């Protein structure tokens, strides 16, 4: 089954409100195997709403609308649906009585007795439409069959929309689809690999599954990491798990050391877990990341069992005074080099009495530094057996580079503790670590 999302409201077009409803609906529909082909935003105009509905019905089986069901003059979804279907509006007696009861129960209107005249618009329905109950607000939803398709309209208020979709819209969609209602996802989280490398490693498996159609693999890159999502549809969970198992095995084999966990894991949590298992501790020295690395580690409950603390040595002279980095080294190579990162790591390890010292230095931009291009990153990791480094060129703007730097640093610790290769990111590349 194919679905299109249609959001109504000038406020969405002007950027006053972000369309978070579309993201939420997309996830819910994907979970039950409904394919969302298009997501559209249209302004508060009856003709534009009607046209958007007609176009969507030409391409999809169901159209799911949000917004424009309020009581004011610019709430025009009801009129737009009626225009798309070529029908008029009718006042629904049951909805009118429900509206009066809702206002009375909420103590609104004239002393809780009279509904403002404008609100009665919410009791209007296109001819032939069915109302969808709203358990938390005054605006009922709309279910309208037009041709062979169905239009569902829900309020734009997220908590009202979420409840209505779960209680009324989704069950109706599943009845119409006549497809297995069980959809299971398996997520593999990766780090230390460019997104393109993850996709290339799984290209053969993706091609094989494309010919079969079930399960499916999707790549979700964000925050410097790539998630691999395997989705199977089946009659029950056990059957879906059986479909996923060989695909997961093939993916783990192809990605190797790049996989660090599943859906509920975080890279920082995995690193701290490895440290605790070894009765080891970690301290960090940060330049380019400016405290972000320590922040990620301390976001994990119980981090104090393995995390000693950190030093933000942002200025070059602080690298010497706080960490003991040799001033001659800083003069010769500057603050941004692999040798400086190694010295910072050794310094913070010694200063804070940790088993391992981790350091980051680089150029976040927007201007180059010491003739080093924006995106240059050097990481040092000092431990009982010596020091290792990782150097990489990261893409993006300043916030993105700093986020990626944190992920790359944590991944270096993970690989070292687990006895895994230092990864392809010891060389310059493009994409997300």
Curated annotation (Swiss-Prot):
CDD domains associated with the record: cinA
SUPFAM superfamilies the record matches: CinA-like, Molybdenum cofactor biosynthesis proteins
Pfam families, per the entry: CinA (PF02464), CinA_KH (PF18146), MoCF_biosynth (PF00994)
Classification via InterPro entries: CinA, CinA-like_C, CinA_C, CinA_KH, Competence-induced_CinA, MoaB/Mog-like_dom_sf, MoaB/Mog_dom
Superkingdom classification of source: Bacteria
Annotated HAMAP family: CinA_B (MF_00226_B)
Similarity comment: Belongs to the CinA family.
NCBIfam families tied to this protein: cinA_nterm (TIGR00200), PncC_domain (TIGR00199), PRK00549.1 (NF001813)
The protein's name in its UniProt record: CinA-like protein
């Amino acid at each position: 089954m194919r679905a299109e999302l249609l959001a109504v409201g000038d406020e969405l077009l002007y950027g006053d409100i972000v369309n978070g409803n579309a993201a939420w609906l997309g996830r819910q529909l994907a979970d039950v195997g409904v394919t969302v082909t298009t997501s559209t935003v249209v302004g508060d105009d009856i003709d534009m709403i009607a046209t958007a509905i007609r176009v969507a019905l030409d391409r999809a089986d169901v159209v799911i609308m949000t917004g424009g069901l309020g009581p004011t003059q610019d709430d025009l979804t009801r009129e737009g649906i009626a225009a798309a279907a070529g029908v008029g509006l009718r006042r629904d007696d049951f909805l009118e009585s429900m509206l009066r009861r809702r206002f009375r129960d909420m103590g609104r209107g004239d002393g809780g007795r009279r509904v403002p005249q404008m609100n009665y618009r919410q009791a209007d329905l296109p001819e032939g439409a069915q109302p969808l109950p709203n358990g938390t607000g005054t605006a009922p939803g709309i279910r309208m069959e037009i041709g062979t398709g169905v239009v569902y309209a829900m309020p734009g208020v997220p908590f009202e929309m979420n409840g209505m979709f779960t209680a009324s819209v989704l069950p109706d969609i599943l009845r119409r689809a006549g497809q297995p209602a069980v959809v299971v996802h398996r997520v593999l989280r990766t780090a230390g690999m460019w997104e393109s490398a993850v996709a290339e490693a799984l290209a053969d498996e993706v091609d094989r599954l494309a010919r079969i159609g079930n399960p499916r693999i999707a790549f979700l890159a964000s925050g410097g990491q790539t998630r691999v999502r395997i989705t199977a549809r089946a009659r029950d969970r056990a059957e879906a798990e059986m479909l996923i198992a060989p695909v997961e095995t093939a993916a783990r084999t192809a990605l190797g050391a790049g996989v660090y966990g599943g859906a509920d894991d975080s890279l920082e949590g995995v690193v701290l877990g490895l440290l605790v298992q070894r009765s080891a501790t970690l301290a960090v020295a940060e330049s380019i990341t400016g405290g972000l690395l320590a922040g990620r580690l301390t976001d994990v409950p119980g981090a104090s069992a393995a995390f000693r603390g950190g030093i933000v040595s942002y200025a070059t002279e602080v690298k010497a005074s706080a960490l003991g980095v040799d001033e001659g080294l800083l003069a010769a190579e500057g603050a941004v080099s692999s040798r400086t990162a190694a010295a910072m790591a050794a310094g913070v390890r010694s200063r804070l009495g940790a088993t391992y010292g981790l350091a980051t230095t680089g150029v976040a931009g927007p201007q180059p530094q010491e003739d080093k291009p924006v995106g240059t990153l050097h990481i040092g990791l000092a431990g009982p057996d010596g020091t290792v480094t990782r150097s990489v060129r990261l893409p993006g703007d300043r916030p993105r580079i700093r986020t990626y730097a944190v992920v790359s640093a944590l991944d270096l610790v993970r690989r070292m503790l687990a006895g895994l290769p230092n990864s392809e990111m010891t060389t310059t590349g493009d994409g997300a670590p």
